[in-house]
């Protein structure tokens, strides 16, 4: 039998599943403005692409903001609603193979969860800064809405045309415990010659630095170094370099595991697997 997880978001629905032997099946996502349409579309596409019969599905674990639109069954298969934050924590630990970490879900907004194997995940808080911020400000500053295009453009950007750095304020930052290449103020030095590429990189840097610093504070509060980054923003092109810089600046281990964009839905499916095993 197969245990399915479905994460119903505002603009896309993600689906992941585990076989009875614990093997993860290839996750996928479906875009749709209507959550009900996207749920049925995702499940239909999943069964078709994996040659899965509905009767092979033991249960469907539903999570996400749009999960309220899903009833007690889909195509006749039972649905169980599970905590999104619990799913974030379980998925992050599973993908990273860590026993204890801060798990960050980077979606339209950002949520931070403290997860430890065998324990209930703890929601630490979050911020409205996330993918929605990037979409909105890209529209206002650049006249662009497709984040993949904005991300591609950001790769050729120059932050020195946008951000105020510690080196712009003092040459003695090291004596204060500050690296010269640290950001003093995002968008604090926007040049008249700043290009769209520069502004694009500035936007990504502002959002990712905000998420990174919140992750640092959360990690220090729990006495851990490992931070697992999940959600669709975790795999967008400028993320890797920006988070690598934060790793080098602070005593952190920011991790982006394989399938990180599916962390929450994988965590939901894992919850179903564990419930099934406990009943055996």
List each language-model region with its residue ranges.
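Conserved phosphate-binding/catalytic loops in two-lobed NTP-binding clefts
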Residues: 79-85, 244-267
